[in-house]
UniProtKB/Swiss-Prot annotation:
The lineage of its organism: Bacteria, Bacillati, Bacillota, Bacilli, Bacillales. Its EC number is 3.4.11.4. It catalyses: Release of the N-terminal residue from a tripeptide. Binds 2 Zn(2+) ions per subunit. It is found in: Cytoplasm. This is Peptidase T. Its cofactor is Zn(2+). Cleaves the N-terminal amino acid of tripeptides.
Amino acid sequence: MKQELIERFTRYVKVDTQSDPESNTCPSTQGQWDLARMLVEELKAIGMEEVTVDENGYVMATLPANTDKNVPTIGFLAHLDTAPEFTGTNVNPQIIEQYDGGDIVLNEQQHIILSPKDFPELANYKGHTLITTDGTTLLGADDKAGIAEIMTAMNYLIQHPEIKHGKVRVAFTPDEEIGRGPHKFDVAQFGAQFAYTVDGGPLGELEYESFNAAEAKITIKGKNVHPGTAKGKMINSIKIALEFQQQLPANEAPEHTDGYEGFYHLLSFQGNVEETKLYYIIRDFDREQFEARKAKMKDIAAALAQKYGNDRISIEINDQYYNMREKIEPVHHIVDIAHEAMTNLGIEPKVKPIRGGTDGSQLSYMGLPTPNIFAGGENFHGRYEYISVDTMVKAAEVIVEIIKLFEQKTS
């Protein structure tokens, strides 16, 4: 499996699939189409059936059952796109055999070093084969590692027909990084009763709780007057925007929260005297707290509108996804099976909430309960991203083991 995973993964990351939140197409970028078409050909080549890609770039395929038991159809998903925050153009993966535990020079010319001093978790990977960036791009382990692991697991099952399994569906989806992954996903066509996203981080991650998530767009209109004659006339929209931000609790920001704590995150602040636009994301695991956060932002906007004039402040809040725990709890055995699969392979499951969202957050509310399992990457979305190939092998093995357990547990 190891060489197959390296070969697949290093090939996939060289396709630039950054998604674009400004685009209205699906997929949002041409590169995702390029990878989707490549995967269609590979799925056919390894012997998968019912291989399709629809007009929105969703790739689906079937591994037919080889057992007489009536096993539930399960699915595995990974996403095609990489994060828009950091360049994914001309990714040049570096392979480090038998990592020695020291500094890794990513880019000598630019003095970019991946060091255990900055990233202590590197110590866990001594002796592993690592794949890193060259310091100028992200790597794309999020989530091309998941794609490579699903492909490798399917190929393994096709090559080993003695392993009994039910029907398995796989899907590779666009635009997860900009929150649109499941928007045009056809759950009925996919036809699985349960699924797993292979989109987690380090070895053993198993997640079935995600944030409740919303975005808030605030527009503040000021009044620009020549500063020499501005007394009593000028209204500076930037200052009102600062007033808005200062009324949010300073300690409820991403840099001050972890575990089950929620936050307000000011993602963008653009403006001048005449007009300022603020863009926030709101996150909380608890539904009541989530609703309270949205209400607080509306209350601040209303108070400032009263102070400066109703036509000066507008706020628009849109929900993005909800905590998938609500939909997975009633079918908790799918989490238990993933837990057992890891334990069977000597992996310690690390069950924790996702401080983010996956496609599974939305899919679970669309009728397809979908927890998330590890894919192996570290330091996603930036130049210090890396992955252990040894962990990738374990992820592919967990996929195979989950499929085996579903068959074994069906009478």
